[in-house]
Amino acid sequence: MEFVLTFNQPVEEIERHDDPQQGPAAMEPWKAYMGEMAAAGVMRGGNRLAPPWTATTVRSRGGQRMVQDGPFADTKELAAGYVVIDVASLDEALKWAEKSPSTAIGSTEVRPVARPPQ
């Protein structure tokens, strides 16, 4: 079963990853985590997202397009990245989510990939 793990972090942590001085050390736990998933053969893909302030949100209401700079969500934790994993069960996906560096400082959302009906 495929699952998407979305890594949600406080803005301060996202800024730390982009800081030239703090970034390399901030990325070390992520390198270890991704390496562990790759070694286990469960990782199918994923990426770090650009900082939330680079986002543009588009909505359409009544045929009118509305564009907003920045992320739509007004929360303390914002999506910082994602990975697609292929594991046997939700329980196994939850175990990988628990190991995520985001889980200790923010959250990790686990969502199954929906397949179109046959």
Identify the residue ranges that each predicted region occupies:
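Conserved, structured core segments of small domains
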Residues: 1-118
